Regions:
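Flexible, processing/modification-adjacent segments and terminal tails
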Residues: 38-56, 62, 71-72, 105-107, ...
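Gly/Pro-enriched, hydrophobic low-complexity segments
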Residues: 141, 163-256
Length: 266
């Protein structure tokens, strides 16, 4: 009888241990999950854009377009004001010097100094490559579209250089005027964009933008390089590398006009 009672006690004790372990596991994973869900995904995206773009910026970059049998390098000066206004002018090579692009909101204009002509890009041209690169005109003109036209969900986390990274799934809002069927974004806890993947309406990966070589730049941690890579095409990509970058509190409104597009301030 004593052996039987001992057996019952041991069995009940093991059951109690298992129940406690199960309860602890549920609580542990609930805490982890609630920690992820407690973060507002839209706030993360907005903070990421605010950090990356700042109030205003002036930069000089080298843009290298790489193809299997050729390579082109442009030196570009850029001015940005918030998420809506940008001005780009080509400094080199000499034959392309003075070519420019102006972005105001979702509208874009290009300037060709050889014919002294400004052209406003129609919607049908917005999906075309910008300067023959892997960045489209849409990529430049709709920098704030990710904030306004998509709904965001945190789907996981990972670690990058000992810092937490939030993985965010962004899907278009109903009737949103967007090209992509989904975007998958990785934003670090210190507001740095790490990766942005673009999917078509069939949820097939089209291209991925990676932000690399994070270092002190422009007075704060910043990715020195951005690499836009086409899916399943290792030899087709575009690298944008910052040479000069400064962040400003403001830039004159006159910087972002058709007049400045033709005659940018150097």
């Amino acid at each position: 009888m004593n052996n039987f009672n001992n057996f019952l006690k041991k069995t009940n004790f093991n059951k109690l241990k298992n129940l406690k372990f199960l309860a602890f596991s549920v609580l542990f994973f609930s805490v982890i999950q609630s920690g992820v869900m407690a973060k507002d995904p839209l706030a993360l995206v907005v903070s990421g854009f605010d950090y990356m773009r700042d109030k205003a910026s002036v930069s000089v970059v080298d843009m290298t377009i790489h193809r299997p049998d050729w390579k082109r390098v442009f030196t570009i000066k850029a001015w940005t004001l918030g998420n809506k206004n940008s001005l780009f002018t080509i400094l080199a090579p000499a034959k392309d010097n003075g070519n420019g692009t102006l972005k105001k909101g979702k509208e874009m204009w290009i300037y060709n100094p050889k014919v002294n002509r400004v052209i406003k890009l129609p919607p049908s041209m917005m999906s075309q490559a910008w300067m023959g690169s892997d960045f489209s005109n849409n990529d430049l003109s709709k920098s704030d579209s990710l904030i306004n036209d998509y709904s965001h969900t945190i789907v996981g986390t990972e670690v990058h250089e000992k810092k937490k990274v939030y993985i965010i799934k962004s899907v278009p809002k109903p009737q949103a005027p967007v090209v992509w069927g989904m975007q998958r974004i990785k934003i670090r806890e210190d507001n740095l964009f790490i990766e942005q993947a673009f999917y078509d309406e069939e949820m097939k990966l089209v291209k991925t933008l990676k932000f690399t070589d994070i270092q002190m730049f422009g007075g704060k941690l910043y990715p020195k390089k951005m690499i836009m890579q086409k899916a399943n095409e290792k030899d087709k990509y575009t690298i944008v590398e910052y040479k000069i970058l400064s962040f400003e509190n403001n830039l004159p409104a006159g910087m972002f006009t058709l007049s400045s597009l033709k005659n940018p301030r150097r």
